[in-house]
Amino acid sequence: MMKTIRKISYLLLVISILPILSSCNNEDDVVKIFTGKTWKMTFIAKEGSKEQYNFWGEQGMTSENAAYKNSMDALAKEGNFILNFEGGDLNGTAGGSFGGRASTTSVSGTWNANGESKRLDITVEGKPVDKDVYGKAFITGLQNAIRYGGDENNLYIYYKDGQTTKFLAFHPQ
């Protein structure tokens, strides 16, 4: 009888400790997500949509629209619309420096991201100006970043553009 009670007590103890041992951490490994790869932008969309946002006005996203065609040619070109993040963990947040290229200009600056809240702060150095419509939107997205989403295979940088929230979508190159 005592052995049975002891076994039940041990079993209850193990069961009560199990949730503590297996508790999960909902915080992202931000350094692993951002660093160690070149991120290539794939598109820009409005929050809640997976469709390319129309930055090209009334003519829209057609091959007849020279501005749209120029943007898509620039996007397809290797070395354009890329970001490289460097950094490490700094007391629960990650941060460091970044560099990259829009369409016709380079960008660089600093970044800081919180893995728990997903808050993202990006400071772009200088005042880069891109001649391409999509390049301008890329720079605006970095300058107005508010949070990030994704994982090691997809990165989304959300930003405010007036009253609208949009995001830059990236994939490792």
List each language-model region with its residue ranges.
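C-terminal motif of bacterial Sec signal peptides marking the signal peptidase cleavage site
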Residues: P19-S23
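Lipid interaction determinants
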Residues: Y10, C24-Q173
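Outer/extracellular conduits and scaffolds centered on Gram-negative outer-membrane beta-barrels
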Residues: L13-S16
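Bacterial N-terminal signal peptides that target proteins for export
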Residues: M1-L11
